[in-house]
Each structure stands twice: as structure tokens, then as C-alpha cells.
Amino acid sequence: MFENLQKAILIRRYKRFLADIELHNGNVLTIYCPNTGAMTGCAEPGDQVWYSTSNNLKRKYKYTWELTFTKGGHWICVNTARANQLVKEALHNSEIEALSGYSQIKAEVKYGTENSRIDFLLSNENKADCYVEVKSCTLLEQPLAEGKGFFPDTVTTRGQKHLRELIEMKQQGHRSVLLFAVLHSGIKSVQAAGHLDVKYAQLFEQAKKAGVEVYCYYPELTLPCLEE
């Protein structure tokens, strides 16, 4: 997944979806930023960025920002689409013990009363269906050494909706799981960011009381093949 990436230095992120980077030869390149969040601490000018190349000729921007290597020495996966890809691989390999033992793994299944799609629906004979909602976590707050991660990094009405849907599934007798995919190498634990989204934090507590299970998954962010 993180193979054949190229390195540059971040100049700036702007318009949410764009970033300017400086290549090793001094040239400036505009790349696609696949992250709609605030990206606090993930997009500081001067940080190293690692980007992938697409062969899709229809794309306006050929290059995609995948990873940040911070001045503090942490790896961050800023491409939020990678969270589900990493979790999918982990589920198929039974790497997440709490979610192992299911024979069927389906992605993007419609469910709930608010027109949602669950990231993963796990099923097996003699087991309740398990609804798994994945959220990528990259917000590491001060003091950094404590490793406290928070979600979300900004107000998320979509995230609030997903918590309501998980509560509903649990009330119907299914298993409901909120899985934080920790995509920041400095984060050691995750909690709801009530200082950024009060409503989400309230729903998070309601969900836990209703029996929604909360887990963290820490995928390996080492890079097997890097090209400078």
C-alpha cells in the first residue's frame, strides 16, 4: 500500500484538497490532498510528505499526498481512504482479535434509518451480525509525549449520525463496533474530542452506555519501499 512513494517538503495545504510541495530539485508541485479534516499537526510547512502517482489520465492531479513525517519524528497517514483498506486487510487476516471468527466480511452495506452505509458488516452462523464503523484518528494533542489522540478533529455531523446508527443496531440485537484506525505513530490512546465537537462526545458516551463496543487498531506505518 505504501510502496513506491516519493518524498518532498510541504509548502502549504490550501482549499482543503490541495497542497504545494517542493521536490528535491527545487521544483514546486501541486498535489491532491485526500483529507477533508482540519489535519491539525499533520500539515505543518517544512514537514516531509510522501506522495503516490496515479496513471489515471482523467485525474486533474496526478499525485496524491499519502504520508507525513513530522519534525517530531512521527509518521502520519493523511489519506483517510487508507483507514478502511488497512482495516479490511486486518479483518481478512484475523489481526483484530475482537473482530475475528466471522466467515463473511462485507463492505459498504446500507443500513439504519438515516440512509447510511456501514464500513464493514461481519456475519457468521450462530453469531449476531457485527456492524463495524471505522474512523481514522490522526489528532495528537499537547503534550505530545502523552500520546493522547482525539476524534474528531473538527465538528462532524456525519460522525454523529454514524453513532446514532450504531446505537440503533445495538438496540435491535446486533453487535455494534466503533473502530478507531490510529494513523499517527505517536498516538497511544483515543478519546472523543469534546472540546471540538460537544455533540459527538455526548453521543459517544451514549453509545458506550448502550453497549456499542469501542476499539483502537494500530496499523503498522512502516514503509517497505520508498523512492526519493
From Swiss-Prot:
Gene3D superfamilies membership: 2.40.50.580, 3.40.1350.60
GO MF entries: DNA binding
Superkingdom of this protein's organism: Bacteria
Pfam families named in the record: SfsA (PF03749), SfsA_N (PF17746)
Family: Belongs to the SfsA family.
Protein name, per record: Sugar fermentation stimulation protein homolog
Species the sequence originates in: Psychromonas ingrahamii (strain DSM 17664 / CCUG 51855 / 37)
